[in-house]
């Protein structure tokens, strides 16, 4: 295949991905948590959710700071995050193309197949949008894999792997896990090919770059926030269980999360080819570096994902680097089996890509069907949490849009000394510019370190106790709420002494009606345009 044709097909993959991601074109509620930190960083020089009380309720330092820098030039994060996510995803397509080219040769037509598969993937396209750091982390990991492969022929290339993995580790907490996998892959390959037990100069430089960048940052954030790990770790993966059986439930949910990934991506049908693709007997070749690095990463990353229960967001943003690994492995497997017969190989590739695209078109369609005005307890499957745990993109979209609408409508109703207990610390506090903490404890060190794990759901294992929540002396309790379609509020099913239910009419709410009932302290004498009296 000519160079021109390969680049033309890569450009087609890029166009497919951009169009595919625009079908989703949303920002999920969790992204707005980082946006609050970005705004406080840009406007006040503080990486905190509530000014004056730094709590590390985010795990994406580099992404949060980057969005904050764009806010300094008046570009809002709900725009910059989507543009940057798309650019990072396009970078991943190019790096994947380059990686396969390194492994199979400059003229190999197989190099364009993996980017096309990624562009067609519903999960990859969904989280190209979404507003999260997912694609920044993925492009950094893919860049590190490219450096690992390139180092077979140019040993100095391994140095940039250390730099990229340092930034990856400042973007997602799984970064050090990737560093261990790729570092082990490089060390073992060198050991097998050179019989040298000690790392070489280039490997030492790579380690120095990693530690020199990541180490000072780790020390700074420990000093700044007071704990060695992010607050989200203590909320999601630390502490005793109220019921010890919940630990097993989390692992079972992790296996289910992995199974859904295998079935939705149709990778379950291509596992034999992926296994064949990850076999490379000659340890001196770039192909061995690629397949060994991919295999080691999968062996540590997937069990880790299972151990924490997977994720509560649909379409697998939590294991996005595995999309790249899977695409590469499948392509290498197909090349191994059919590569000697070019015409057969071409037919197999066309059929594989078209069949995959058809399944992903249907998945994207169902993932983006509107959930407006639905009763989610009895509604269609695309609006109900899968297995009671994994929220669909369709639900995430309508949930976030409603919280953004509430925040905008109530922004001018808050006083500087008001404090809120929130159900989600995302779009609602971002647009309302309110102070508060979420009942799950993501931005509360009190809940993170003071409450046990009581819910077997990924990312939401803790729920603030009444005593710990009351210690904040809140003015509003938004975690106790109802959305409804008539002015008369239904029973809330929860209550606080000294608080009263408040009902607001907020035009534009989509989920279950335009009326929103929550709790406010009676002594606040709360009034706001739109209050139903």
Name each region found by the language model.
Residues 1-533:
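Membrane-proximal envelope and lipid/glycan-remodeling enzymes
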């Amino acid at each position: 295949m000519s160079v021109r044709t390969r680049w033309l097909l890569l450009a087609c993959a890029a166009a497919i991905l951009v169009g595919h991601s625009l079908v989703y074109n949303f920002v999920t509620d969790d992204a707005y948590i980082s946006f609050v930190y970005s705004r406080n960083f840009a406007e006040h020089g503080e990486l905190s959710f509530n000014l004056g009380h730094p709590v590390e309720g985010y795990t994406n330092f580099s992404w949060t700071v980057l969005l904050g820098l764009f806010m300094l030039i008046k570009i809002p994060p709900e725009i910059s995050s989507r543009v940057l996510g798309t650019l990072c995803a396009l970078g991943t397509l190019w790096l994947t193309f380059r990686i396969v080219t390194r492994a199979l040769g400059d003229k190999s037509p197989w190099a364009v197949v993996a980017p096309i598969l990624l562009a067609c993937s519903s999960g990859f396209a969904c989280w190209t949008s979404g507003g999260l750091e997912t694609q920044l982390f993925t492009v950094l990991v893919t860049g590190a894999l490219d450096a690992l492969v390139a180092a077979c022929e140019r040993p100095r290339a391994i140095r940039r792997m250390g730099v990229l993995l340092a930034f990856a580790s400042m973007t997602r907490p799984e970064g050090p896990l990737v560093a261990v996998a790729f570092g082990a892959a490089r060390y073992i390959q060198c050991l097998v090919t050179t019989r040298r037990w000690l790392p070489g100069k280039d490997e030492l430089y790579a380690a120095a770059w990693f530690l020199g960048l990541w180490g000072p940052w780790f020390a700074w954030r420990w000093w700044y926030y007071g704990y060695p790990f992010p607050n989200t770790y203590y909320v999601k993966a630390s502490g005793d269980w109220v019921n010890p059986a919940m630990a097993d439930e989390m692992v079972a949910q992790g296996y289910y999360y992995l199974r859904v990934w295998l079935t939705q991506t149709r990778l379950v049908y291509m596992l034999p080819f992926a296994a064949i693709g990850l076999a490379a007997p000659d340890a001196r070749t770039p192909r061995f570096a690629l397949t060994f690095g991919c295999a080691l990463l999968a062996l540590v990353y997937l069990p880790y994902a299972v151990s924490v229960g997977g994720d509560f967001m649909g379409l697998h943003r939590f294991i996005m680097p595995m999309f790249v690994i899977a695409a590469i492995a499948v392509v290498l497997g197909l090349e191994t089996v059919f590569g000697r017969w070019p015409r057969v190989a071409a037919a197999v590739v066309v059929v594989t890509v078209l069949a995959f695209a058809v399944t992903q078109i249907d998945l994207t369609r169902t993932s983006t069907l509107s959930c407006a005005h639905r009763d989610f307890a009895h509604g269609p499957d695309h609006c109900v949490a899968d297995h009671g745990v994994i929220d669909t993109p369709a639900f995430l979209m309508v949930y976030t849009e409603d919280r953004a609408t509430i925040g905008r409508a109530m922004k001018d109703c808050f006083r500087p000394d008001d404090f809120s207990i929130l159900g989600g610390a995302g779009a609602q506090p971002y647009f309302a510019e309110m102070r508060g903490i979420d009942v799950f404890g993501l931005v509360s060190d009190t809940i993170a370190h003071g409450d046990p794990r009581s819910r077997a759901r990924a990312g939401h294992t803790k729920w603030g106790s009444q005593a710990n929540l009351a210690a904040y002396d809140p003015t509003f309790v938004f975690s106790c709420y109802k959305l409804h379609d008539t002015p008369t509020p239904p029973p809330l099913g929860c209550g606080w002494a000294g608080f009263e239910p408040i009902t607001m009419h907020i035009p534009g709410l989509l989920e279950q009606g335009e009326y929103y009932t929550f709790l406010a302290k009676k002594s606040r004498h709360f009034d706001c345009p739109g209050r139903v009296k």
